[in-house]
UniProtKB/Swiss-Prot annotation:
Protein name: Anti-CBASS protein Acb1
Species in which this protein is naturally found: Yersinia phage phiR1-RT
Gene giving rise to this polypeptide: g142
Main function: Counteracts the host CBASS antiviral defense system. Phosphodiesterase that enables metal-independent hydrolysis of the host cyclic di- and trinucleotide CBASS signals such as 3'3'-cGAMP, 3'3'cUA, and 3'3'3'-cAAA. Does not cleave cGG or cA4. Besides evasion of the CBASS system, might also enable evasion of the type III CRISPR systems that use cA3 signals.
Keyword entries, A-Z: Host-virus interaction, Hydrolase, Inhibition of host innate immune response by virus, Viral immunoevasion
Similarity remark: Belongs to the anti-CBASS protein Acb1 family.
Annotated signal peptide: none
Lineage, highest ranks first: Viruses, Duplodnaviria, Heunggongvirae, Uroviricota, Caudoviricetes
Active site: H44, T46, H113, T115
Length: 153
C-alpha cells in the first residue's frame, strides 16, 4: 500500500530503445539536419506522466513496438519540438494500463512519440512516413519530476 506522501509524488514511466533503434534515430536526425538533436542517451518515449503514484509494473523483454513514424512539430512553451509520432499499439496499451490503475494524464490524448529535438526553431518538416524499426530495450519508472525541462539546459 502506498503512503500519502508516496502517492502525492507522482510517477514517470518511459520506454528506452535498442542500440539499433538508437542508431536509426541518430541517422534520421543527421539526414534531416535536425538542430539541437536529443542526445542518444536521452532518446525515449514517455508512457506515463502521472501526478499521482500508482503501482505500475514495468514490462520486460525486447521486441518491436513500431515499424514507422511521421514527423510533427509541436508547440511546447517557447520552443517548438520535433517529434517522430509512432503508430504503436504497444505504447498505447501500456499508457492505457497506467490509466486503468489510476494514473493521471495532463493531455486530452496520448500520442506515442520519440522527441528528436526540443527546439527546432522555425524549421518545418514534411509529414511523410519514415520506415524505422523501433525495438524496445526496457521500460523504466521513477518518481515524477515536474521540473524535468531543467535537465535539458
Amino acid at each position: 500500500m502506498l503512503t500519502f506522501d508516496e502517492a502525492a509524488e507522482g510517477l514517470y514511466v518511459a520506454a528506452k530503445y535498442s542500440e539499433l533503434t538508437l542508431d536509426a534515430i541518430e541517422m534520421l536526425q543527421r539526414e534531416l539536419k535536425v538542430p539541437n538533436p536529443v542526445p542518444r542517451e536521452k532518446i525515449h518515449s514517455t508512457i506515463c506522466y502521472s501526478r499521482v503514484m500508482v503501482p505500475y509494473s514495468v514490462a520486460s523483454g525486447s521486441f518491436e513496438v513500431a515499424t514507422s513514424g511521421h514527423l510533427e512539430v509541436w508547440n511546447h512553451g517557447s520552443s517548438p519540438l520535433l517529434v517522430l509520432v509512432l503508430d504503436s499499439d504497444y505504447l498505447r496499451c501500456r499508457h492505457q494500463y497506467a490509466r486503468a490503475i489510476g494514473a493521471t494524464h495532463d493531455f486530452q490524448d496520448y500520442t506515442p512519440h520519440i522527441t528528436l529535438s526540443y527546439n527546432v526553431g522555425v524549421l518545418k518538416y514534411p509529414k511523410e512516413k519514415y520506415p524505422i524499426r523501433v525495438v524496445l530495450d526496457r521500460e523504466y519508472k521513477e518518481p515524477l519530476k515536474l521540473d524535468w525541462a531543467d535537465d535539458l539546459k
